[in-house]
C-alpha cells in the first residue's frame, strides 16, 4: 500500500489534494471519512491514514470558514463606514 493520501496521485489510496477542495467538498469527504472510521473494519495503518486525512480535511474546512468570516466582517465594516460617511454628508448638507 503506497502513501498517497493528499498527494493526488493515481492509485487505490489516492485522494485529491486537500488544498484543491472547496469547503463543501472537504466537508462531505470529512463526513464520509468519519463514517468509514466509525465502522472500525480497517487495520491500524489504513485507519491512521483515514484519520490523518480527516484531520487535514477538518483543518481545510476551518480555514474556509475563517476566510468566509473575515470576508463577512470586512463587508460589514465597509458597509458601516459607508453608512457613517453618508450620514455625515447628510448632516453637513452634502448630497
UniProtKB/Swiss-Prot annotation:
Q: Which chain positions lie within coiled-coil regions? A: none
Which InterPro entries would you find in this protein's record?
Exonuc_VII_S, Exonuc_VII_ssu_sf
Its GO biological process terms?
Answer: DNA catabolic process
What Pfam families does its record include? Answer: Exonuc_VII_S
Q: What is its EC number?
A: 3.1.11.6
List locations, semicolon-separated: Cytoplasm
SUPFAM superfamilies in the record: XseB-like
Instruction: Report which reactions are catalysed by this protein.
Output: Exonucleolytic cleavage in either 5'- to 3'- or 3'- to 5'-direction to yield nucleoside 5'-phosphates
Q: What is its main location?
A: cytoplasm
UniProt KW keywords: Cytoplasm, Exonuclease, Hydrolase, Nuclease
Give one GO molecular function term: exodeoxyribonuclease VII activity
Superkingdom per UniProt: Bacteria
User: For this UniProt entry, what's an example GO CC term?
Assistant: exodeoxyribonuclease VII complex
Described function:
Bidirectionally degrades single-stranded DNA into large acid-insoluble oligonucleotides, which are then degraded further into small acid-soluble oligonucleotides.
According to the record's subunit comment, the protein's assembly and interactions are: Heterooligomer composed of large and small subunits.
Query: Would you identify the family this protein belongs to, as annotated?
Result: Belongs to the XseB family.
Q: What is this protein called?
A: Exodeoxyribonuclease 7 small subunit
- Give the species this sequence originates from: Corynebacterium aurimucosum (strain ATCC 700975 / DSM 44827 / CIP 107346 / CN-1) (Corynebacterium nigricans)
Amino acid at each position: 500500500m503506497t502513501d498517497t493520501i493528499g498527494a493526488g496521485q493515481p492509485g487505490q489510496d489516492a485522494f485529491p489534494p486537500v488544498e484543491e477542495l472547496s469547503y463543501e467538498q472537504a466537508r462531505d469527504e470529512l463526513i464520509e471519512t468519519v463514517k468509514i472510521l466509525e465502522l472500525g473494519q480497517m487495520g491500524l495503518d489504513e485507519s491512521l491514514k483515514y484519520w490523518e486525512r480527516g484531520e487535514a480535511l477538518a483543518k481545510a474546512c476551518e480555514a474556509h470558514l475563517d476566510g468566509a468570516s473575515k470576508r463577512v466582517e470586512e463587508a460589514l465594516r465597509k458597509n458601516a463606514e459607508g453608512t457613517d460617511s453618508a450620514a455625515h454628508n447628510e448632516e453637513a448638507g452634502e448630497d
